[in-house]
Amino acid sequence: MTKFLSSYNGRNIYIKDFSIHPRRCGRLLYLEMGKDELANLIEKLRGWGELHGPVKKGKFHSFERFDSIDEIDLNYTRTMIPPKKYFTRPREAIMRVNLRKGYELLEEDPKRIVLFGLHACDINAMKIMDSIYIDEFPDPYYAERRRNSFIVGLSCIPDEECFCKSMGTDYAYDGFDLFLHDIGDAYIIRVGTERGLELIRGLDLRKPSKDSLKKLADSERKRSSMFKKELLSSHLPDIADSLHDSDAWKEYIDRCLGCGSCTLVCPTCRCYDVSEYVDLNMENGFRMRRWDSCFLRSHALVAGGLNFRPTRADRFVHRYNCKSAVNRVTNLPYCVGCGRCTVFCPAEIDHVEVLNSVWGVVR
């Protein structure tokens, strides 16, 4: 949980969050850093843990390990796979079994990692994942990895597929240790946690000038005006609750391949499957947890051969209902508007178009 901070090097420099984001105005510690100091910040972060950030690979970006600031793209829009891959592994063994020795739970021994350059939508998605994997029934693997992660957010410019503004996730109020806002000739740093404050001690930072704070406010207003897509998010509960059997879905269901790509790239999809494997000698085995997708026919298959979502249509509508729900802990929608499902859909199905079209047909 974020702890609001009081001072930096003995100076009180609380600054109220900007009124452009009036939903949760609090008081955070703001500092200004020249861009020539970024390399020194990276070195400080390297001392905390292994560095990971947005690296361009071909046409797309991926969160990968990096050593130099020159290896990452600070102007990226989105990665293909979200940062959840660091906390819920796509595939991992969680238990080993031996016929004579019994079973052994495989404990996590994570290294400390720094995730540098996360955008607000992904930070808000991680808050949702935290509420699922930590708040009620803690998952020891996830929780330990989160404890050993340091989150550095980075401001971004939306492209034509971003709709996080419609979902209320275009700004991160918490969920990070540090957040960097690019104001052209410098960065404004919002400090989110005590350990974030401790890490930046010794850097050449200063209290932001009035001119710098005006640049920050202006850049946030400009960014807010750049979103092209708009989802009628106030109607999402109605879509989820009452439109399951509407014929308005049919056009998109017919185009859908049922491949599950949208769930794999979604930063809040968290379904997994647990399987057990035994060696041919029948003496050794292990239990494996891996990502699953509600778009796959096997996902809803239960004992006796019953499948409670047997058709692609059932699975298609189910996913949109799931993403339209609101997380009761964070009060955020399960869709954070990152645009990944649209960008990486092989059938070119547009998430916003689907929901706006369905609502438009029946309203």
Residue ranges and their predicted role:
Residues 233-254, 272-363:
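Ferredoxin-type iron-sulfur electron-transfer modules in oxidoreductases and energy-metabolism complexes
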Residues 231-239, 256-267:
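Oxyanion-binding "anion nests"
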Residues 126, 267-271, 346:
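Active-site-flanking alpha-helical
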Residues 2-240:
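Iron-sulfur-associated redox domains of electron-transfer enzymes in respiratory
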Residues 194, 261, 267-274, 299:
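Histidine- and/or cysteine-centered catalytic micro-motif in compact active-site loops
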Residues 155-169, 269-275, 283, 294:
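Functionally engaged cysteine thiol sites
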